[in-house]
């Protein structure tokens, strides 16, 4: 830690306080995440250290780079590249009645998918994607932050400040207590973020797990074994759930064209096995008119 100076506290993440800091010799500005662990006495679990070390290998222009992992007084600090704005804050700055430019929505979604495909191809899930951990710069680049931390530290039910961790972007298989889940959980989250990019409003903003499920069911219909094999045997599925009929996504998300709504509907398919993959999503006709040559991941490929 002696290599870094804390400049100021910039926020409170899922796992602890985040500081803006500076490397004493290089002058590079960084984000320093102090990880607060449930069992303070026992120190940092070796599994967490192992998981985190793997994340240092994830180098991609749309992933926030983990530069260093440091220990001080049995506290773990993760040193990340610094970006000053997250997507939630950015959407909040857009004046009422105005929306994100359609080409920006498309570019952001494409870059988010490029980042997720990179991680999924390396068997790393995010599991907790939301606008707060999508960071942006002033050049139109968007990066995914906090990758893999859910696996290393678990997703707490409450942030250590006792604020409830948001359920708005969580997939139905996780909400219904499925023990076996995989890459489709991230695709669902990206689908809900896609809708929010277009409308500035969360698509499903439940205030409890059951409210979250019912908001999804009201929009997409209550799932059953016909549309999602074995859903009725998931731990938290109840036969007493109200049986809502599927509605039209277009009524909830009005700023998307036909291709956009088609892609969104494929990202929000109940059955994880049928949900579109990140790789397939990148090839969807929605992106046909996007100039991909200027995107950061594509610029690197040229060299």
Curated annotation (Swiss-Prot):
The entry summarizes how activity is regulated as:
Thr-14 and Tyr-15 are phosphorylated maximally during G2 phase, but dephosphorylated abruptly at the G2/M transition. Phosphorylation at Thr-14 and Tyr-15 inactivates the enzyme. During M phase it is also phosphorylated on Thr-161. Finally during G1 phase it is phosphorylated on Ser-277.
Q: What Gene3D superfamilies does the record tag this protein with?
A: Phosphorylase Kinase, domain 1, Transferase(Phosphotransferase) domain 1
Q: Where does this polypeptide localize?
A: Nucleus; Cytoplasm, Cytoskeleton, Microtubule organizing center, Centrosome
List where the protein spans the membrane: none
Q: Does the keyword Cytoplasm apply?
A: yes
Q: Which reaction does it catalyse?
A: L-seryl-[protein] + ATP = O-phospho-L-seryl-[protein] + ADP + H(+); L-threonyl-[protein] + ATP = O-phospho-L-threonyl-[protein] + ADP + H(+); [DNA-directed RNA polymerase] + ATP = phospho-[DNA-directed RNA polymerase] + ADP + H(+)
Residues of the active site are: 128
CDD domains xrefs: STKc_CDK1_euk
Give the superkingdom in one word: Eukaryota
- What is said about its interaction partners and assembly? Forms a stable but non-covalent complex with a regulatory subunit and with a cyclin. Interacts with catalytically active CCNB1 and RALBP1 during mitosis to form an endocytotic complex during interphase.
Question: Per its record, how is this protein called by name?
Answer: Cyclin-dependent kinase 1
Instruction: List the source organism.
Output: Gallus gallus (Chicken)
Supply the source organism's classification: Eukaryota, Metazoa, Chordata, Craniata, Vertebrata
Gene responsible for this protein: CDK1
């Amino acid at each position: 830690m002696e290599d870094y100076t804390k400049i100021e506290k910039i926020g409170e993440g899922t796992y602890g306080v985040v500081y803006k800091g500076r490397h004493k010799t290089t002058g590079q500005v960084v984000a320093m995440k102090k990880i607060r662990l449930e069992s303070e006495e026992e120190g940092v679990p070796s599994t967490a250290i192992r998981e985190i070390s793997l994340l240092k290998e994830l180098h991609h222009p749309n992933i926030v780079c983990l530069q260093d992992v440091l220990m001080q007084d049995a506290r773990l600090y993760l040193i990340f590249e610094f970006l000053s704005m997250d997507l939630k804050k950015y959407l909040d700055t857009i004046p009422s009645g105005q929306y994100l430019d359609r080409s920006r929505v498309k570019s952001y979604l494409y870059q988010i998918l490029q980042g997720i495909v990179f991680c999924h191809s390396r068997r790393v899930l995010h599991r907790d994607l939301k606008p707060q951990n999508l960071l942006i710069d002033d050049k139109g680049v968007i990066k995914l932050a906090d990758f893999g931390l859910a696996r290393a530290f678990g997703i707490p039910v409450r942030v250590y400040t006792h604020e409830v961790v948001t359920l708005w972007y969580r997939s139905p298989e996780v909400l219904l207590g499925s023990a076996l889940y995989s890459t489709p959980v991230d695709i669902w989250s990206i689908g809900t973020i896609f809708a929010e990019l277009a409308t500035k409003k969360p698509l499903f903003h439940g205030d409890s797990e059951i409210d979250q499920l019912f908001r999804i069911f009201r929009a997409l219909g209550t799932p059953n074994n016909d549309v999602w094999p074995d859903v009725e045997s998931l731990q938290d599925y109840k036969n007493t759930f109200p049986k809502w009929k599927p509605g039209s996504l277009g009524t909830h998300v009005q700023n998307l064209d036909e291709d956009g709504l088609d892609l969104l509907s494929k990202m929000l398919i109940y059955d994880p096995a049928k949900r579109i993959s990140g790789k397939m999503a990148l090839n969807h006709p929605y992106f046909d008119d996007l100039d991909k040559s200027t995107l950061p991941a594509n610029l690197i490929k040229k060299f």
